[in-house]
């Protein structure tokens, strides 16, 4: 699906001026004039107040703002113009979120995604929209996202952990951008950045953030989004999903042969897809091809202890003063269980204080895990090919209850 679309709409020629900067001719617009014509607010780096009451402002700029839609927001910013940046308005959003309130799955229709951004932008800011040469709109970035499905969240987390050490050729893991449920490659690349992450974890985080807001302070689209995200069927579909996201910049789009003009790109996509292919999926495959080669022949040690974790959590939990359930003690016992799996019963017994060891063993036995089983845990038979879990099936990216979204204007 198209998970992010960044478009740049240049200003009409009559508003664009030029100036010489060294040997470079710089195109720019007068931001104060744009603000007057469109009604937009600007920021000023310097404001001077004179004794006669006059104000002088300098260093005008426009910060990113968010336009509300039915389900989500569209970010936009006015750029004055510089050596490497033609004066324009940049708009960016997740078309999936704008169209349906979530990005667990979504459309690969470039025309529909573009329409969702442009029509909402035109409807919200018609005066600014009229100052732009819409036909000259260019694509600045496309995020193409597809998912592999692990048997459960426990194994999905292990896949992410294994991917942290995978790289190939020019595709390098960016360790400073890696979190518990996310791995990033080529973070600073001007061509494409690759990301793998757990969708169910992200979805739960979004729900938690929205739920923590007082209802009176939530916007109408945030309320709609929370309603969509809380759908049990959606949460079930997201469980076990390992997302592979390609953030594709203009240089990489051009190397694939995609025109950067939006409307030329839409025509290109239409012709391309008529051949029985899918442009967005092939762009995604092109972006990940080097990294996926590293998966061939690779294997990882997989353990599926979700049933064990459930048993421990059902026995060892506490209720906090705020009424929430804490599984801190269960997490410690499960960590001990994992040590038994990886290091062996006898080895762990030799490296822990005797009283602590027996206390942890007793806690696991209380959960219904026989001591004889704890003494014979092994990972020897759990080595499986990595590609078994990195199988991105294009035909199963959406549930059977999916319908192509219909554009709603806020």
From Swiss-Prot:
This is Replication-associated protein G2P. Isoform G2P plays an essential role in viral DNA replication. Binds the origin of replication and cleaves the dsDNA replicative form I (RFI) and becomes covalently bound to it via phosphotyrosine bond, generating the dsDNA replicative form II (RFII). In turn, viral DNA replication initiates at the 3'-OH of the cleavage site. After one round of rolling circle synthesis, protein G2P is linked to the newly synthesized ssDNA and joins the ends of the displaced strand to generate a circular single-stranded molecule ready to be packed into a virion. Keywords: DNA replication, DNA-binding, Endonuclease, Formylation, Hydrolase, Ligase, Nuclease. Transmembrane segments: none annotated. Its EC number is 3.1.21.-, 6.5.1.1. Pfam families: G2P_X_C, Phage_CRI. It comes from Enterobacteria phage fd (Bacteriophage fd). The keyword Ligase applies. It catalyses: ATP + (deoxyribonucleotide)n-3'-hydroxyl + 5'-phospho-(deoxyribonucleotide)m = (deoxyribonucleotide)n+m + AMP + diphosphate. GO terms for biological process: DNA replication; rolling circle single-stranded viral DNA replication. GO terms for molecular function: DNA binding; DNA ligase (ATP) activity; endonuclease activity. It comes from the Viruses.
């Amino acid at each position: 699906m198209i998970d992010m679309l960044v478009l740049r709409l240049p200003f009409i020629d009559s508003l664009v001026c030029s100036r010489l900067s060294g040997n470079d001719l710089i195109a720019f617009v007068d931001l104060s004039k744009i603000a007057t014509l469109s009604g937009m607010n600007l920021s000023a780096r310097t404001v001077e107040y004179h004794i006669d009451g006059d104000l002088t402002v300098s260093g005008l700029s426009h910060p990113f703002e968010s336009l509300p839609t039915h389900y989500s927001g569209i970010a936009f910013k006015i750029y004055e113009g510089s050596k490497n940046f033609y004066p324009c308005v940049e708009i960016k959003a997740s078309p999936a979120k704008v169209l349906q309130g979530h990005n667990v799955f979504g459309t690969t229709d470039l025309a529909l995604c573009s329409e969702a951004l442009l029509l909402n932008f035109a409807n919200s800011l018609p005066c600014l929209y009229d100052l732009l040469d819409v036909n000259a709109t260019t694509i600045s970035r496309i995020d193409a996202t597809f998912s592999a499905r692990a048997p459960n969240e426990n194994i999905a987390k292990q896949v992410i952990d294994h991917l942290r050490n995978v790289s190939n050729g020019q595709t390098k893991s960016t360790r400073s951008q890696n979190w518990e449920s996310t791995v990033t490659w080529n973070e600073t690349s001007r061509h494409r950045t690759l990301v793998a992450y757990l969708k169910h974890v992200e979805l739960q985080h979004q729900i938690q953030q929205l739920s923590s807001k007082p209802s009176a302070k939530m916007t109408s689209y945030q309320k709609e989004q929370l309603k969509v995200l809380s759908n049990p069927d959606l949460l079930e579909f997201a469980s076990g999903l390992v997302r592979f996201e390609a953030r594709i910049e203009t240089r990489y789009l051009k190397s694939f042969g995609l025109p950067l003009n939006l409307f030329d790109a839409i025509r290109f996509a239409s012709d391309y897809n008529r051949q029985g292919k899918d442009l967005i999926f092939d762009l995604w495959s092109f972006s990940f091809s080097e990294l996926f080669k590293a998966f061939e022949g690779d294997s990882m040690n997989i353990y599926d202890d979700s049933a064990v974790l459930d048993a421990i959590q059902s026995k060892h939990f506490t209720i906090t003063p705020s009424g929430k359930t804490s599984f801190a003690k269960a997490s410690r016992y499960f960590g001990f269980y994992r040590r038994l799996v990886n290091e062996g019963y006898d080895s762990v017994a030799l490296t822990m204080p005797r009283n602590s060891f027996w206390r942890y063993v007793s806690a696991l036995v209380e959960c219904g895990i026989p001591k004889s089983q704890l003494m014979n845990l092994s990972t020897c038979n759990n080595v499986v090919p990595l590609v078994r879990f990195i199988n991105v099936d294009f035909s199963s990216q959406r549930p059977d209850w999916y319908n192509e979204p219909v554009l709603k204007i806020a």
